[in-house]
């Protein structure tokens, strides 16, 4: 997501560096980062942090990482997360943020690092010439398969018809994934809505009567 530069975020991130992951050209050791062996989940494009903060508060024995390209957005998300944990009188020990690009995930993390990956309302990159930048392009699907455990899951949500169709096409180009949920109208499916956690964008789009797609795929390696 795009967000105008906020002058306070750099200082805020420096003051709260404990909650940030820094990549120094070595594989990131998640056990060292979280000081436990709990399952770890990754949200690629964590936005203002509503989704991953809600997950982390609901599942204190699972580790979560929110990844964004923009340090400004990360600052906004981290501030929100810390406030939500404080409001519930809980220490934020299972949620970290970091800035980087999805292209670099295999360099930063070892194989089988994550139990689940979330892609929520990623940039659809609508121009045809930009199709390789879409986060469900087959190159990215291969990266996710590498860093995800066998039989781990990737959850994808979008309101964009073209990105949904593109994602299905890309999944048909690889044998590393099995589609286990393909909801073409999430909010008319009570079964899939039971445990649904909406993002900021999702709430906005749903209130505007936009259709929401959800795909869940299992990593076959």
Swiss-Prot record:
Alphabetical keyword list: Methyltransferase, S-adenosyl-L-methionine, Transferase, tRNA processing
Residue positions of the active site: 123
Pathway participation: tRNA modification; N(7)-methylguanine-tRNA biosynthesis
Highest taxon above the source species: Bacteria
Binding sites annotated in the UniProt record for S-adenosyl-L-methionine: 43, 68, 123
Catalytic reactions on record: guanosine(46) in tRNA + S-adenosyl-L-methionine = N(7)-methylguanosine(46) in tRNA + S-adenosyl-L-homocysteine
GO CC annotations, alphabetized: tRNA methyltransferase complex
The UniProt record lists the keyword Nucleotide-binding: no
Record SUPFAM superfamilies: S-adenosyl-L-methionine-dependent methyltransferases
The protein's Enzyme Commission number: 2.1.1.33
GO molecular function: tRNA (guanine(46)-N7)-methyltransferase activity
This protein's record includes keyword Transmembrane helix: no
PANTHER family for the chain: 3-DEOXY-D-MANNO-OCTULOSONIC-ACID TRANSFERASE/TRNA GUANINE-N 7 - -METHYLTRANSFERASE, PENTACOTRIPEPTIDE-REPEAT REGION OF PRORP DOMAIN-CONTAINING PROTEIN
Protein family (similarity comment): Belongs to the class I-like SAM-binding methyltransferase superfamily. TrmB family.
Function: Catalyzes the formation of N(7)-methylguanine at position 46 (m7G46) in tRNA.
Name by which UniProt lists this protein: tRNA (guanine-N(7)-)-methyltransferase
The species this protein was found in: Mycoplasma mycoides subsp. mycoides SC (strain CCUG 32753 / NCTC 10114 / PG1)
Gene: trmB
